[in-house]
Every structure is written in C-alpha cells, then in structure tokens.
Design a protein with these regions (language model features):
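Catalytic cores of nucleotide-sugar-dependent glycosyltransferases that transfer UDP/GDP/TDP-activated
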Residues: 2-172
Length: 172
C-alpha cells in the first residue's frame, strides 16, 4: 500500500494513506486510524459479543472527519477487520459520498458472518446465511456468543449499499 501511495505522490497525486493499527502516524498524509485503547476495547468487546467490526465508534468518527476534509475521489480499502474501524459507519459514510471505492479483499471476512477463512473447516454457510459458526475460537475470537447470522446479514446489507458502478472488488 505504501509503495502505491508513494508512487502516486511522485506523480503529483494528492494521496493519503491510513492504516488500522500497530504503527504511529507519520505525517498528515500517512496516518494511523485507531488508538491503542480503541483497538483493545474493540477486541475485548468483540470477544464477548462476536461483533468484530461494529465497535471503534470514536476512532471511526475521527477518521471519517479526516475524509470529510480530504474529500477523496477514490477510497481504496484493504482488510477492514482488525478491531480498528466500525464497518457500518464507514459504509454508511461511503454511501453518502461521490467517490469511487476499490476494495482489495485479502480474505473472506467480508462475505461471512464471522471467519476470514471458511475453507479451513469446509464451511459453506456463507453462501446462504451464516449461523452456528464452527470457527468462533479462531480469529476473530468470540468466547460467549455466536452472532454470525446477524453479522452476515448486517455485512451483506452494508457492503451492498454501493452500486457496482461505484465499487470495484479486487481479490489477489
């Protein structure tokens, strides 16, 4: 991602890059979205509720405020799970914008109710509606609840808010 960002900048494009966690903000054009406390809170709540991707309200609002300032022509998403962004708030914001969206999928989390790798256990519930998830103990770990059916429905609704003309999916 950073190579693409730097290549765009070298060509005179006003490019910005944001990432979820682990590295501190470098400058105005290269910033971390999440606070450490936000990641821990999101991860902890998700472990109890199986709602990974639906917390981080404060960090998401701050990120979207930055996008409001930038007013991007294109938003290129990569993995949007990892306890740092609220996918509902992100996609509801994207639905109100005129920008194009490119989403590079590095795993299957976007199309399942819980897991990023359904093929590990040969599960095909994601095709018709997740439930009784066999991978709650794997990433993203959920200890007490199985919300895979609700998550699958919510993600399906959110991730189809943008028309095919506005969003391009890429799978390496």
């Amino acid at each position: 991602m950073r190579n693409l960002h730097h290549d765009l900048q070298e060509k005179g494009v006003d490019s910005f890059i944001f990432w979820g966690r682990r590295h501190e903000t470098i400058n105005n054009h290269e910033q971390c979205i999440a606070s450490r406390a936000g990641v821990y809170a999101h991860g902890g709540l998700a472990r109890f509720t199986d709602r990974a991707g639906f917390y981080s309200h404060g960090d998401t609002r701050r990120f979207l405020a930055k996008l409001d300032e930038i007013r991007p022509d294109v938003v290129h998403l990569h993995n949007i799970h990892g306890y740092y962004i609220n996918v509902a708030e992100l996609f509801e914001w994207l639905a109100t914008q005129n920008c194009k969206v490119i989403w590079t999928l590095h795993d299957c989390w976007a199309i399942t109710g819980h897991c990023p790798h359904f093929q590990y256990v040969g599960c095909e519930r994601w095709k018709t509606g997740c439930h009784d998830c066999p991978q709650l103990g794997g990433y993203p770990t959920a200890y007490f609840m199985d919300q895979s059916e609700r998550n699958w429905k919510d993600k399906r609704r959110l991730f189809t808010m943008l028309s095919a003309e506005r969003m391009l999916l890429v799978s390496p």
